[in-house]
From Swiss-Prot:
Protein family per UniProt: Belongs to the PsaA/PsaB family.
Organism taxonomic ancestry: Eukaryota, Rhodophyta, Bangiophyceae, Bangiales, Bangiaceae
Subunit-structure text: The PsaA/B heterodimer binds the P700 chlorophyll special pair and subsequent electron acceptors. PSI consists of a core antenna complex that captures photons, and an electron transfer chain that converts photonic excitation into a charge separation. The eukaryotic PSI reaction center is composed of at least 11 subunits.
Annotated PANTHER family: OUTER MEMBRANE PROTEIN, OMPA-RELATED (PTHR30128), PHOTOSYSTEM I P700 CHLOROPHYLL A APOPROTEIN A1-RELATED (PTHR30128:SF19)
Cytoplasm in keyword set: no
EC numbers, comma separated: 1.97.1.12
Binding positions for phylloquinone per the UniProt entry: W671
Protein name: Photosystem I P700 chlorophyll a apoprotein A2
Length: 734
């Protein structure tokens, strides 16, 4: 007899109902729960999957390069990056009529195309690519790399090449290799590429496979390096008149500390970036030699952690026991990794627009908006995932004996204090922020706008001033010419930085007022509420006052019957589920704020944001409603235009989002009845009843229905806002 899906669970494969399929899919990646799984095999499977993951990433990037080279307009764009619209790829759609063919043939193409809003053109241009040939070479290289990684993944599943468990748990060598190799050497390689290829190309000097061994990146060669006279590499930088991509106004410096932006491209100086990556490379390569391996020198991580004990002795055992706890729990490792990656992704969102690293990207407003929104949403999902795996760690991997009185145990012991403090913060922020907004709404509605409560963000303005913003008149740190901080940096990076921060032509330290003060606190409310739900979910994952034995029920149980006074909605999974809604809510406010503030600045109409953002109706009317007009008019009785695709996506996003509620607001009985009815109708419908199935249709479980609802809600939410951002920005700025 053929074995049924899933092969990894005998119990599930013998289930006679449709539960077999859904639970099979749901637990396919929960390797720990599979039949016959050993710890060693678990690590080997996950390790091999990393190769597959990298292969997919490189294949995807290769596809980007290939399609732009084949169907894009990279070479035309390079000649005029500010005016030519970058093409991502062609569109072939048999439904297109003449108006659609005409509307979507843009960016200088004779056929319908998609415009690229990802910033890849700016990225490839900045790193020195100039021709389609360069793009094809890159695509081919990444394709080969992808194939090699797939082979590597396969190889590491073969008996002779499977690493043993001790190799996976060998922390110090892994840390050394990741610090020196992953961060250090890759940063050094980045510096090398910038110095040898990107900077010469930015100065009009072509560097390719044909001449890279003969073109000196600096006239003095390596002589200053070996003689210790390193400052030579910083002399004669590009001038303020430099035209990017030509030698007009170009210098010879390769490692500088100019500060600020290249006046024409409005991006960070390439020579500053090279210097930055070189410094990081040195720091990380040194850091990668700090931990003890086969030779008896260097730090031992267990010793370091065990030595981390609060001095008085009243605060417990500190980090004792953490070494083994973290080494033996993949969930806490994943939780820490996701949290770190989440933070850095959000930082990327912030820095990508405030300090654009790629030439001319600052002037491609739709790309700026897309990249910010994209990275903030990803950061949100990563952070929620971090807490989810933190909760699974407490359910599956946490050993109270091993962690007696250390930081983990103490967090669990005073979780009531942590949770209640977070609760007070959210209540305070929620009532006060909403109170101010609603008061202002009422005053506007009654025609007395002067009675609004408007609070200047003086502390934030003071911080901006200390970084050099002169507008507010604070005489502090970098905004004071006599301050020691100003004098210390005045000969190197400071003039460029001060010019940039006060120019008004970029997004560095934007001028803030009462509207910013309010939305800042609304976002703080969202962040603290999401954190409250996630922290409570993780800290209560093992048990709570109501249900002390939660751990025995696992991570994602739905309820435990009515016996204890009703135990529904209290598993760690339920906390994750609720937190995702709050996360989306918060990122929504963050991106609304960023987008509205920026489109008013880009249109030279900052007053609109300043005046309308102090009350809720202003947000609904002057941001959401006003900017949705290109979506509402994407197609109408008179035909269509090149925003029609976003209008359709806007409608479709709403549909997906609304479908989510169908799963969220109904319970099991409804589903079972619905399925029985559908099955009954199917069996009595001619032709359709030729198709039979053996599994008895059963309703989705409570947890499954919620997951399906949550997935639709999230996907629809992001899809709707993506279409809104793209259409409202592209509709204004092309």
């Amino acid at each position: 007899m053929a074995t049924k899906f899933p092969k990894f669970s005998q119990a599930l494969s013998q289930d006679p109902t449709t539960r077999r399929i859904w639970y099979g899919i749901a637990t396919a990646h929960d390797f720990e729960s599979h039949d016959g799984m050993t710890e060693e095999n678990l690590y080997q499977k996950i390790f091999a999957s990393h190769f597959g993951h990298l292969a997919i990433i490189f294949l995807w990037t290769s596809g980007n390069l290939f399609h732009v080279a084949w169907q894009g307009n990279f070479e035309q764009w390079v000649l005029n990056p500010l005016k030519v619209k970058p093409i991502a790829h062609a569109i072939w759609d048999p439904h297109f009529g003449q108006p659609a063919l005409k509307a979507f043939s843009k960016g200088g193409s004779a056929y319908p195309v998609n415009i690229a809003y990802s910033g890849v053109y700016h990225w490839w241009y900045t790193i020195g690519m100039r021709s389609n040939q360069d793009l094809y070479s890159g695509a081919l290289f990444l394709l080969v790399l992808s194939a090699l990684l797939l082979f590597g993944g396969w190889l590491h599943l073969q008996p002779k090449f499977k690493p043993g468990l001790s190799w996976f748990k060998n922390n110090e060598p892994r840390l050394n290799h990741h610090l020196s190799g992953l961060f250090g050497v890759s940063s050094l390689a980045r510096t090398g590429h910038l110095v040898h290829v990107a900077i010469p190309e930015a100065r009009g000097q072509h560097v390719g496979w044909d001449n890279f061994t003969t073109v000196l990146p600096h006239p003095a060669g390596l002589q200053p390096f070996f003689s210790g006279n390193w400052s030579v590499y910083a002399q004669n930088p590009d001038t303020a008149q430099h035209l990017f991509g030509t030698n007009e106004g170009a210098g010879t410096a390769i490692l500088t500390f100019l500060g600020g932006f290249h006046p024409q491209s409005q991006s960070l100086w390439l020579t500053d970036m090279a210097h930055h990556h070189l410094a990081i490379a040195v720091v990380f390569i040194v850091a990668g030699h700090m931990y003890r391996t086969n030779w008896g020198i260097g730090h031992n991580l267990k010793d370091i952690l065990d030595a981390h004990r609060p001095p008085s002795g009243r605060l417990g055992a500190g980090h004792k026991g953490l070494f083994d706890t973290i080494t033996n729990s993949l969930h806490i490792q994943l939780g820490l990794a996701l949290a770190s990656l989440g933070v850095i992704t959000s930082l990327v969102a912030q820095h990508m627009y405030a300090m654009p690293p790629y030439a001319f990207m600052a002037k491609d407003f739709t790309t700026q908006a897309s990249l910010y929104t994209h990275h903030q949403y990803i950061a949100g999902f990563l952070m929620v995932g971090a807490f989810a795996h933190g909760a699974i760690f407490f359910v599956r991997d946490y050993d109270p004996e091993q962690n007696k009185d250390n930081v983990l145990a103490r967090m669990l012991e005073h979780k009531e204090a942590i949770i209640s403090h977070l609760s007070w913060v959210t209540l305070f922020l929620g009532f006060h922020t909403l109170g101010l907004y609603v008061h202002n709404d009422t005053m506007i509605a009654f025609g007395t706008p002067e009675k609004q409560i408007l609070i200047e963000p003086v502390f934030a303005q003071w911080i901006q001033a200390s970084s050099g913003k002169a507008l507010y008149g604070f005489d502090v740190l970098l905004s004071s010419s006599t301050n020691i901080a100003t004098q210390a940096g005045s000969n190197i990076w400071l003039p460029g930085w001060l010019e940039a921060i006060n120019s008004g032509k970029n997004s560095l330290f934007l001028t803030i007022g009462p509207g910013d003060f309010l939305v800042h606190h609304a976002i703080a409310l969202g962040l603290h509420t999401t954190t409250l739900i996630l922290v409570k979910g993780a800290l209560d994952a093992r048990g709570s006052k109501l249900m002390p034995d939660k751990k025995d029920f696992g991570y994602s149980f739905p309820c435990d019957g009515p016996g204890r006074g009703g135990t529904c909605d209290i598993s760690a999974w339920d906390a994750f589920y609720l937190a995702v809604f709050w996360m989306l809510n918060t990122i929504g406010w963050v991106t609304f704020y960023w987008h509205w503030k920026h489109i008013t600045i880009w249109q030279g109409n900052a007053t609109q944001f300043n005046e309308s953002s102090t009350y809720l109706m202003g947000w609904f009317r002057d941001y959401l409603w006003l900017n949705s007009s290109p979506l509402i008019n994407g197609y109408n009785p008179y035909g269509m235009n090149n925003l029609s695709v976003w209008s359709w996506m806007f409608l479709f996003g709403h549909l997906v989002w609304a479908t989510g509620f169908m799963f969220l607001i109904s319970w099991r009985g409804y589903w079972q009845e619905l399925i029985e009815t559908l099955a009954w109708a199917h069996e009595r419908t001619p032709l359709a009843n030729l198709i039979r199935w053996k599994d008895k249709p059963v309703a989705l479980s409570i947890v499954q229905a919620r997951l399906v609802g949550l997935a639709h809600f999230s996907v629809g939410y992001v899809l709707t806002y993506a279409a809104f951002v793209l259409a409202s920005t592209a509709g204004k700025f092309g």
